[in-house]
Amino acid sequence: MATHTTQTAVGEREDLADVIYRIDPDETPIFSALKKETSNGIFTEWQVQELASASATNYVNEGANATFATPTATARFGNYHQISVKDVAVSGTLEAVDKAGRDREMAYQRVLKSLELRRDIEKSIGDTDVARDASDPRKSASLTCWMTNGSVGAGGSFATGDGTDTITGGTDRALTLALIEDGMQDAWEDGGSPKMLVASATNRANFSDLSATGNLVSNDVNMTAAKATTYVGSTSVYLTDFGTLDVAPSRFMGNDRIFLIDPDFASLCTLQGRNFAEKDIAATGDAEKMQLVTEWSLKVQAPKAHSVIYDLNGS
């Protein structure tokens, strides 16, 4: 008598896990580190005050008359808000059927689109786009449009630092600790104190490789603790002559740049009522529709407080 097996039987239920595993990354180190502010217009502006240069000859005669120098005026900066959206349309049938891993499809899509929108903003902040006004879809100037400290390769040049133009690339070169130290010194001399180094995966690994030369000492692991041997191949905190840097990898940055950011002098502004706002769109046919919209701008309160190391060969 033949044995009845699953190969010949009919009616077995599928074994589909009631969990959805998401592999795509959603970490956004720059977006997460920036302060969050609310704005009331499509063009957000701010002022930066610099002190007069220190003088070693500030001495006068007894009874001397007062002399009045022209005060140092503030510098006025501004950046446009850009509108970033994600749209979702879910059929009535899909919402009604029994689904694995989620109950309501629209609610699930809202979560996904929110994560995707954060990733888009992260990538835009680290890009090289200049500010654009209403003659085109408005665009917020990226970090490279504000930074004038750090270094570029031979033949390259920094932006003017007001958001209206961007960095000009030069000759590629390898990442070195000296480039990082110089960038930190530039920002420190102008009153900044970068606390965050953001790099692509390639440059993050290259930075850790620099520790293999013996120039860096890692204290990530408590060597006195009674535990299994741990081999340290990464440097996550770097103590420079001009401050301590937390090293953060970003999946949304190019291999040609590294940012040294002072989070005290940069923020993400969103227009009031437009911060990841969910808008239900009128149904057309048998579908539920929604738009997730945020109107945001990068606000770099003190451009000289940061540095960029550009024209890296990323190898």
Kindly give the residue locations of the regions a language model identified:
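Flexible, glycine/threonine- and acidic-rich loop/arm segments that mediate assembly and lattice contacts
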Residues: 1-237, 241-315
